[in-house]
Amino acid sequence: MREQAPVRFGTPLTAGATRVMLLGSGELGKEVIIALQRLGVEVIAVDRYDNAPGHQVAHRAHTIDMSDPEALLRLVEEERPHFVVPEIEAIATDALATVEERGTAVVIPTARATQLTMNREGIRRLAAEELGLPTSPYEFAESLEEVRAATERIGFPCVIKPVMSSSGKGQSTVRDTGGVETAWEYALAGGRINYGRVIVEGFVDFDYEITQLTVRAIGADGEVGTFFCEPIGHLQDSGDYVESWQPQPMSDAALARSREVAEKVTAALGGRGIFGVELFVKGDDVYFSEVSPRPHDTGLVTLRTQRLSEFELHARAILGLPVDTTLTTPGASAVIYGGVDATGIGFDGVADAMAVPETDLRLFGKPESFVRRRMGVAVSTGPDVETARSRAREAASRVEPVA
């Protein structure tokens, strides 16, 4: 189907404005908002708590329970955006389907894609059972007894995760039967919404894992095409990213296979926008892990490595504009954690951190800090990935959160 950008972009805060509503306004949403505003778009930021990072820069901000379909539909009807862009998982996806059916707004990428990716069950069944993509062995369970049985069939080590969570919350690796009950309880506590259901995954003995940022955007022929960023390598701790770098060195065969997998799953989801496709790589073999239909946390590195960051690419794809995935320099990112449980924290050492060559910081402005909450990121470039990684780690270590 041939698609096109809006014929005319309006002026924010006027009757002719082009309006985008973001559902979820954390640090990734904040960067998307800034990218949209640079294109003259009026942005409405929505989150579950006041003064979220995106709230602080949007034209208007709302605090609602986005898992409440009536509240979400009321807000969409009130604001009448042209585009509704989910940025988190915990959203009433039935309400998004209603928005699409009524023609109230365009849902990015689609209501169906949001529904399928909001929990690990929907996307895993699509990838493995419908598309036939290689994945780790897996089972779903909704009681401790079912989890125990699943681990016996899959074997140890294995990974137990909530069917819906973000940033690694509720995820743990289990190495023997003694850890199963603790992992089950941790998964129930860590889900965005407690469905009482988990996925038990076999452990993939991978060489490394990547995020293949994949953009579905309108090409020169007026058709939606698929565009790839260079692969992003990353390290995780308890399922939460702590470092990322771009490009990740890969064999030609592994890179081609990664893009084949990414194109298949994103085409099946449809719509426009950027997708973060997480993959395990073992030699030339590639295994699908997860996909997010939005900018990916590991993609924060693109703030300095690409001509257009993942956030700018998402903004352009949303609006039907051309995209450019050119890599301009090797780079890396390293997470700055809160370190303390407190509200309204400060940061010491910022000048020292920014004295590291070719380094920038993003402090997200989250109103509440936790010891393991991501409160900022250091992003560095260099002549090669290893230099950039060393610089990013050093810069992040110089920032000290203080209550």
UniProtKB/Swiss-Prot annotation:
Q: Do you know which Pfam families this protein is assigned to? A: ATP-grasp, PurT_C, RS_preATP-grasp-like
Q: Where does Mg(2+) bind?
A: E278, E290
- List the PROSITE patterns: ATP_GRASP
**GO function terms (MF aspect):** ATP binding; magnesium ion binding; phosphoribosylglycinamide formyltransferase 2 activity; phosphoribosylglycinamide formyltransferase activity
Positions with a binding annotation for ATP: R120, K161, S166, S167, G168, K169, G170, Q171, E201, G202, F203, V204, E209
UniProt pathway annotation: Purine metabolism; IMP biosynthesis via de novo pathway; N(2)-formyl-N(1)-(5-phospho-D-ribosyl)glycinamide from N(1)-(5-phospho-D-ribosyl)glycinamide (formate route): step 1/1
> What Enzyme Commission number(s) appear in the record?
6.3.1.21
Q: Where does N(1)-(5-phospho-beta-D-ribosyl)glycinamide bind?
A: E27, L28, E87, D297, K366, R373, R374
| Keywords for this protein | ATP-binding, Ligase, Magnesium, Metal-binding, Nucleotide-binding, Purine biosynthesis
Top-level taxon of the source organism: Bacteria
Q: What are the residue boundaries of the ATP-grasp domain, all occurrences included?
A: 125-319
Q: What does this protein do?
A: Involved in the de novo purine biosynthesis. Catalyzes the transfer of formate to 5-phospho-ribosyl-glycinamide (GAR), producing 5-phospho-ribosyl-N-formylglycinamide (FGAR). Formate is provided by PurU via hydrolysis of 10-formyl-tetrahydrofolate.
Q: What is this protein called?
A: Formate-dependent phosphoribosylglycinamide formyltransferase
List the source organism.
Answer: Rhodococcus jostii (strain RHA1)
